[in-house]
């Protein structure tokens, strides 16, 4: 992901474009909170360590970003507060109660039909039943807008098969989105009720506007943006993000989706010991060789198989 985005940013700069390449880490939510507890660390320190690891990786892989943002930063909290208040002023937020099946790793609620044998399809883990008082974003209000926009703008989501997947899912019907958490302490306090934290996938998406100084800074020079993302988070970056942007009367970005890297035909998994260490590979073969191999050998938008033998050859 970072290598692909870096290639695009370098190409655009060479062709005279004014580029703002941002990357970073979304640091909040139940997944981070629990991982920090397991490691015996505070969420702040745990998130900082993870972010330092990504910064080091970017340095080794020669990623030419202009801004590395952590969602724990004050600038991001301020923009998040501003945007939530705007959504509320626009009549797109209301208070209610939510009960649903929740995947901690995805930080997302799912319906039963979206699961496979009761497990999240992305992480292959059982979901938890959560019931709590919540504020909601009126996602259902934007269903017809989303269908119309995505159908009329074939380049809005690429590859085409991902655009069709999202479009078909939207046509099945949208439910309003729970945007607060009562049982999660590690997060940005919700502006309308400080006893709640903001849903991580609401505030994490806002980082794109934070890095370009929305609403008073240079954001008009760079928006709408290109988002290069993994196939596991397309829904959040399209159905949810496009609806928020429509409420804010902002243009939609173009969402470009990459696949996953597999190792000997199996998905990467720390738990199963199926891992690739890009830092070690860069030391062994050089970062330029690794960058070139990944860009050349794996068709963009598709899952690709990695082997060290193929890299050597």
Report residues per predicted region.
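Structured secondary-structure scaffolds
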Residues: 1-23, 75-79, 86, 129-313
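N-terminal, positively charged nucleic-acid-binding surface of large information/translation enzymes
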Residues: 1-156
């Amino acid at each position: 992901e970072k290598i692909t985005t870096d290639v695009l940013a370098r190409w655009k700069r060479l062709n005279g474009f004014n580029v703002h390449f941002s990357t970073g880490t979304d640091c909040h939510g139940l997944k981070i909170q629990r991982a920090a507890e397991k490691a015996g660390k505070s969420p702040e320190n745990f998130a900082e360590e993870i972010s330092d690891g990504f910064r080091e990786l970017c340095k080794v892989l020669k990623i030419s970003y202009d801004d590395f943002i952590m969602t724990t930063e004050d600038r991001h909290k301020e923009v998040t507060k501003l945007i939530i208040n705007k959504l509320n002023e626009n009549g797109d937020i209301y208070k209610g109660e939510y009960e649903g099946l929740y995947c901690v790793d995805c930080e997302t609620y799912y319906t039963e039909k979206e699961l496979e044998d009761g497990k999240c399809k992305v992480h292959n883990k059982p979901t938890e039943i959560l019931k709590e008082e919540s504020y909601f974003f009126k996602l259902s209000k934007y269903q017809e807008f989303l269908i119309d926009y995505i159908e009329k703008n074939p380049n809005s989501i690429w590859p085409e098969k991902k655009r069709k997947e999202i479009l078909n899912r939207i046509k099945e019907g949208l439910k309003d989105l729970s945007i607060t958490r009562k049982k999660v302490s590690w997060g940005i306090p919700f502006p309308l009720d400080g006893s709640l934290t903001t849903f991580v996938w609401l505030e994490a998406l806002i980082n794109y506007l934070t890095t370009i100084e929305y609403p008073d800074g240079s954001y008009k020079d760079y928006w709408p943006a290109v988002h290069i993302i993994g196939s596991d988070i397309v829904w959040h970056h399209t159905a949810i993000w496009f609806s928020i942007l429509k409420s804010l009367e902002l243009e939609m970005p173009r969402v470009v989706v990459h696949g996953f890297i597999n190792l000997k035909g199996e998905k990467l998994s720390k738990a199963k010991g199926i891992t690739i260490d890009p830092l070690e590979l860069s030391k062994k073969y050089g970062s330029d060789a690794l960058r070139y191999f990944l860009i050349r050998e794996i068709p963009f938008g598709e899952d690709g198989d990695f082997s060290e033998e193929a890299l050597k050859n």
